[in-house]
UniProtKB/Swiss-Prot annotation:
The gene is mtd. Pathway: One-carbon metabolism; methanogenesis from CO(2); 5,10-methylene-5,6,7,8-tetrahydromethanopterin from 5,10-methenyl-5,6,7,8-tetrahydromethanopterin (coenzyme F420 route): step 1/1. It is an enzyme of class 1 (oxidoreductase). Residues 259-276 have a biased composition (Basic and acidic residues). The keyword ATP-binding does not apply. HAMAP family: MTD (MF_00058). It catalyses: 5,10-methylenetetrahydromethanopterin + oxidized coenzyme F420-(gamma-L-Glu)(n) + 2 H(+) = 5,10-methenyl-5,6,7,8-tetrahydromethanopterin + reduced coenzyme F420-(gamma-L-Glu)(n). GO terms for biological process: methanogenesis, from carbon dioxide; one-carbon metabolic process. InterPro entries: MTD (IPR002844), MTD_sf (IPR036080). Residues 257-276 are annotated as: Disordered. It comes from Methanothermobacter thermautotrophicus (strain ATCC 29096 / DSM 1053 / JCM 10044 / NBRC 100330 / Delta H) (Methanobacterium thermoautotrophicum). SUPFAM superfamilies: F420-dependent methylenetetrahydromethanopterin dehydrogenase (MTD) (SSF102324). The lineage of its organism: Archaea, Methanobacteriati, Methanobacteriota, Methanomada group, Methanobacteria. Keywords: Methanogenesis, One-carbon metabolism, Oxidoreductase. This is F420-dependent methylenetetrahydromethanopterin dehydrogenase. One of its GO terms (molecular function) is methylenetetrahydromethanopterin dehydrogenase activity.
Length: 276
């Protein structure tokens, strides 16, 4: 059986660029068919009203909507449209989504909230395309090496397994905090685990500082250093996350969870061992 998955990508968070890739890392998984539609960097209601109906015209077993701030007007419109649709759907968002998770549940939708997927320092004096790309590369490292992406992988794979078993997919209600992420990372060395925990906690705080610099402080002489400091914090978090993985590599204890020939999740730690 081939499970048909729809992904609606509006705006960008650190999970957005790799979401579909987490499900099919070698582009050879036989049991899923993934289609992605989106609205680029923007997520205003007008863009949402074009992207979501486009996906709903397709025959999908379930749909995932991913964006920043699920409570913002655009994502709120997406939730409204998806809650009225005859297809199981879930929302993936960043920490502001915690404020509307009860609403998401009431709308009959699932959710994954990634607390350490932070807002970027979107001040024109500071953020250019190079800085934007650098920030997102740091987010990806943090979320990959702290285990957050593995939680996303496992959660969606469980939905796929439900559909394969002939059941309606169980819609998740997952908040990825430090404990949830690092547990999924499977670190064996306590120092590696501590570094991963530190990385996740720092990344979680980055959003608070960027919110201050982008919305609360109006003096450029003050808000420019504020958003720059948030990006420096994230770079430090990425460095810690890399150091955590390097410790595990030195001990040959890196946990890897590739997908098998039938789409099942395998596991291994020894580099030269076959996944089982």
């Amino acid at each position: 059986m081939v499970v048909k998955i729809g992904i609606i990508r509006c705006g960008n968070i650190g999970t957005s660029p790799v979401l579909d890739l987490l499900l099919d890392e070698r582009a050879d998984r036989p049991n899923i068919d993934v289609c992605v539609v989106g609205s680029g960097a923007k997520m205003n209601p007008d863009e949402i009203e074009r992207a979501v109906p486009t996906m709903l015209e397709m025959d999908r077993d379930f749909v995932i909507f991913i964006s920043p701030n699920p409570g913002a007007p655009g994502p709120a419109k997406a939730r409204e449209l998806l809650s009225e649709a005859d297809v199981p759907a879930m929302i993936i968002g960043d920490a502001p989504g915690l404020r509307v998770k009860d609403e998401i549940e009431e709308q009959g939708l699932g959710y994954i909230i990634v607390k350490a997927d932070p807002m970027i320092g979107a001040r024109r004096e500071f953020l250019d395309p190079t800085e934007m790309a650098s920030f997102n590369s740091d987010v990806i490292k943090v979320l990959a090496f702290t285990g957050a992406y593995r939680v996303v992988q496992n959660t969606i794979d469980a939905m796929i397994a439900d559909v394969e078993a002939g059941k309606a997919p169980e819609l998740p209600q997952v908040v990825i905090d430090t404990d949830v992420a690092v547990e999924a990372a499977g670190y064996e060395n306590p120092y590696a685990k501590a570094k991963a925990m530190a990385a996740y906690e720092i990344a979680t705080k980055v959003a608070d500082i960027d919110v201050k610099g982008c919305f609360m402080v109006q003096d450029p002489d003050k808000y420019i250093p504020i958003v720059a400091s948030a990006h420096e914090m994230l770079a430090a978090a990425a460095k810690l996350a890399v150091e955590a993985r390097e410790i595990e590599k030195a001990n040959d204890t890196v946990l890897r969870t590739p997908h098998g020939k039938e789409g099942e999740t395998l596991s291994k730690t020894d580099l030269l061992a076959k996944p089982e």
